[in-house]
Amino acid sequence: MANTPHGGVLKDLIARDAPRHDQLEAEAATLPSIVLTERQLCDLELIMNGGFSPLEGFMNQKDYDGVVAESRLADGNLFSMPITLDASKAVIEQAGLKPGSRVTLRDFRDDRNLAILTIDDIYRPDKEKEAKLVFGGDPEHPAIKYLNTKVEEYYIGGKLEAVNKLNHYDYVGLRYTPAELRIHFDKLGWTRVVAFQTRNPMHRAHRELTVRAARARQANVLIHPVVGLTKPGDIDHFTRVRAYQALLPRYPNGMAALALLPLAMRMGGPREAVWHAIIRKNHGATHFIVGRDHAGPGKNSKGQEFYGPYDAQHAVEKYRAELGIEVVEFQQVTYLPDTDEYMPKDEVPAGTKTLDISGTELRNRLRTGAHIPEWFSYPEVVKILRESSPPRALQGFTIFLTGYMNSGKDAIARALQVTLNQQGGRSVTLLLGDTVRHELSSELGFSREDRHTNVQRIAFVAGELTRAGAAVIAAPIAPYEHSRKAAREAVQSTGGSFFLVHVNTPLEYCEATDKRGIYAKARRGEIKGFTGVDDPYEAPTNANLVVDVSKQSVRSIVHEIILMLESEGYFERL
């Protein structure tokens, strides 16, 4: 028998509201609406299908305050993660929203009406408190960065009525709601289910870990990977799901099943581990594996872990009785070549030879095409990963040149384009500042905001081309550090590499060699907001390469860039 849902009742709003579908659909078309972001869509789906039971909507202030401070809803139920609907003041005022109002929630992907929210309250959260108590307070934490840069200033709380399910076009047969998964377990005759959370590909160690957990508890295994939002830079879920499917036959027949979870992770470590346990309980699992640094975001810029290695295990242990799902705490496992088996590290006899491949080492082997041994992963899994993560020589990249006008960056960009075209192996795209201004940003001016927008448009195009395997050479002035940082993050979020080249040619040289007389016009006041004259240029603090046309030839600079790319593995090595 499947586990009892958290709070006692599965809050399946889709099933509850199905008899009123036509009425709700008609009403939704008449109401003001809010278009949801990708993270909000993930949250909405799991509220509506009961994955976040006992929630029936986005948290009002009482629930939010209780969860932030004590991991408890206003009714006393344990819930460790704030689930909120953020909106800007402009959206709230434009829609005329207030307590008691009803508002339609829409899908940004296809503009469908998904739900109606009856508003309890509209409140301004204490983001600093939320960051500290929920995520630990480190401003480099991805959830805190998201909170401070993406989340709007107001939260809207209230209960939901489901209008339509979200549409998915990928792996539809693996997307079980909690109710559907419970029926699936019943059909299979499973009464004890160990759930395994992952946002990464699974290898032999993961298979051994889950089999050990199931064997010890006479249970079956639910592989329950996240396919919503994970950590930037993670392997895409399409690749991961193919790898999970390839792994399944390696389990004893009938032992394991695969189901996908449309969760937007927060990488919240201890808080997230408790949240994950609640979610798996709602999906019918009786046991849940919590490993080392569960749902942690890794290390900050100083090389420090955001959480202790076993903080998540301590958190779920603290609430073990309330969670109502048996938490399986597992140490890391390691490979013993002499006996060809995996074993938890704390059980390995002293002096025994062990082998491990870290995540960083695996990425390096995929990048370089180096051998990945079968003791680490199965050939069919490695084949899928290599298809989606080709070696660097087959990947795209972005060279982002920044500097004053007439610093020589355009000449460098053109010469580099010719050199890369001669090299062959990938298409090459040139995004010069003037060209982009004319073709993509003709309506933008030269205010700080417009300049930032222009650079982000360049970054978007560069990221998409880089994802497709092209070499992109961008050469805007890009005078602001925050714009360049955002551009780097945008390109890297697509899985591509971003190389910042600071063309550090002195302003005096740029001005003295300006044959078009642009600087002279700026000095006379005929052009306002001109970089280097009456608008600052913020020198990069993290350039991959610094060059100077007043001291170097364009040819030598291009050669430096080529050598940088070669050292990073972007050209075939004989």
UniProtKB/Swiss-Prot annotation:
| Transport is among the record's keywords | no
Residue ranges for the region (Allosteric regulation domain) are: 395-574
What's the EC number here?
2.7.7.4
In the record, biological process GO terms are: cysteine biosynthetic process; hydrogen sulfide biosynthetic process; methionine biosynthetic process; sulfate assimilation; sulfate assimilation, phosphoadenylyl sulfate reduction by phosphoadenylyl-sulfate reductase (thioredoxin)
Q: Tell whether NADP is among the UniProt keywords.
A: no
Positions with a binding annotation for sulfate: Q197, R199, A295
One cellular-component annotation, GO: cytoplasm
Q: Where is this site: Transition state stabilizer?
A: H203, H206
Residues the record marks as active site: T198, R199, N200
Which InterPro entries does the record match to this protein? APS_kinase, ATP-Sase_PUA-like_dom, P-loop_NTPase, PUA-like_sf, Rossmann-like_a/b/a_fold, Sulf_adenylyltr_euk, Sulf_AdTrans/APS_kinase, Sulfurylase_cat_dom
List every stretch annotated N-terminal: 1-169
According to its UniProt record, where is this protein located? Cytoplasm
List site positions: Induces change in substrate recognition on ATP binding: F330
* Alphabetical list of SUPFAM superfamilies matching this protein: Nucleotidylyl transferase, P-loop containing nucleoside triphosphate hydrolases, PUA domain-like
Q: In which pathway does it act?
A: Sulfur metabolism; hydrogen sulfide biosynthesis; sulfite from sulfate: step 1/3
According to its UniProt record, which protein family does this protein belong to? In the N-terminal section; belongs to the sulfate adenylyltransferase family.
HAMAP family the record matches:
Sulf_adenylyltr_euk (MF_03106)
Q: Which NCBIfam families match?
A: apsK (TIGR00455), PRK05537.1 (NF004040), sopT (TIGR00339)
- Describe its partners and assembly state: Homohexamer. Dimer of trimers.
Q: What the record says about its domains?
A: The adenylyl-sulfate kinase (APS kinase) is non-functional. It is involved in allosteric regulation by PAPS. PAPS binding induces a large rotational rearrangement of domains lowering the substrate affinity of the enzyme.
What does the UniProt record say this protein does? Catalyzes the first intracellular reaction of sulfate assimilation, forming adenosine-5'-phosphosulfate (APS) from inorganic sulfate and ATP. Plays an important role in sulfate activation as a component of the biosynthesis pathway of sulfur-containing amino acids.
The protein in question is named Sulfate adenylyltransferase
